[in-house]
Amino acid sequence: MNDLIINHIAELILPRSTDKPLKGKELDELNVVKNGTVVIKDGKIVYAGTHTDDYDATETIDASGKVVSPALVDAHTHLTFGGSREHEMSLKRQGKSYLEILEMGGGILSTVNATRETSEDDLFKKAEHDLLTMIKHGVLAVESKSGYGLDRENELKQLKVSNRLAEKYDLDMKHTFLGPHAVPKEASSNEAFLEEMIALLPEVKQYADFADIFCETGVFTIEQSQHYMQKAKEAGFKVKIHADEIDPLGGLELAIDEQAISADHLVASSDKGKEKLRNSDTVAVLLPATTFYLGKEDYADARGMLDNNGAIALATDYNPGSSVTNNLQLVMAIAALKLKLSPNEVWNAVTVNAAKAIDINAGTINTGDKANLVIWDAPNHEYIPYHFGINHAEKVIKDGKVIVDNTLSFKA
């Protein structure tokens, strides 16, 4: 006897299973089954496809008029941080740039101070609250970065919190050491601080899967970023890079040359960088909510990347300064509107390709897969990025069990 059948599904979203990320035109290929059925046993998918009455189960969910998809994957977050920075909104309204706010002692450095002052247990409670919000919105796989400690003690504290969350909730969660995220005030120079972070790589390896660096004007140069990435690979890390967010320094090209698993942001990436994506499996993780929140007009050139047969994914970039949202559904809407992605491209970018960007087996519904699913209160898959700003996730299913039920009920 099976454990659960989800039946009469209006649309069942079945992203293509592949060893490599979907590239170029492949991103627009999505199998959407009308009147679908999903069968689950022992936390695994037994069947997913067109309607069938050939299976029995102890529990049945009628998903008439609903969409069912793989659980979402958020491939770029800064989940563990102390404090908040709502006071910076007035500075943004005055026209202050991100780098200007950073030079004033705000930005990342403000969060660094708050994170350093927050105990590990309090940091855990805050991050847990934010993670549960993500789960309620349909996310069951997350990447979580450090980068707000900027010293040994506090970088380790962030990574330990991230690992504790993964263990408590048994999530598909990857952890990223982003020690070179900014340069703390106490550092004698960028170069000296970078060497401190490189020296930490062997110690943080037990808590982190990836090593990341912020390659940007006023932070770390292309040459410094390459040095760090090479040292990280020597220490056994797969590497990522925050690249070309503000200035076209060539971070995307560097990521491809160093065979990074992903390059993230890429708002200012050059045509040369986009062309190099053609022969690379590095995933371009685009973060349109960041551009939206910062009030900028120029978004990452997703269409240019796809035209060059690149692989792209979408993520929230959840952080307290430049993307204060942990709702990946909102990112889906912004991507459709501002990056000009089709609904199919959006869905693949938050499922199978996002999973490839953090090297996990998720984002698909195939026989034998973990039964990590979302039942959406929406008539079709196009509706979710169309009707923006609310939570469409009705039920979130982890390992075949309903762990979130957002069904609304009112008392008169």
From Swiss-Prot:
InterPro entries: Amidohydro-rel, HutI, Metal-dep_hydrolase_composite, Metal_Hydrolase. One of its GO terms (cellular component) is cytoplasm. Its EC number is 3.5.2.7. It catalyses: 4-imidazolone-5-propanoate + H2O = N-formimidoyl-L-glutamate. Catalyzes the hydrolytic cleavage of the carbon-nitrogen bond in imidazolone-5-propanoate to yield N-formimidoyl-L-glutamate. It is the third step in the universal histidine degradation pathway. It is an enzyme of class 3 (hydrolase). Keywords: Cytoplasm, Histidine metabolism, Hydrolase, Iron, Metal-binding, Zinc. Pathway: Amino-acid degradation; L-histidine degradation into L-glutamate; N-formimidoyl-L-glutamate from L-histidine: step 3/3. The gene is hutI. It is found in: Cytoplasm. Binds 1 zinc or iron ion per subunit. Belongs to the metallo-dependent hydrolases superfamily. HutI family. GO terms for molecular function: imidazolonepropionase activity; iron ion binding; zinc ion binding. This is Imidazolonepropionase. It comes from the Bacteria. The keyword Signal does not apply. GO terms for biological process: L-histidine catabolic process to glutamate and formamide; L-histidine catabolic process to glutamate and formate.
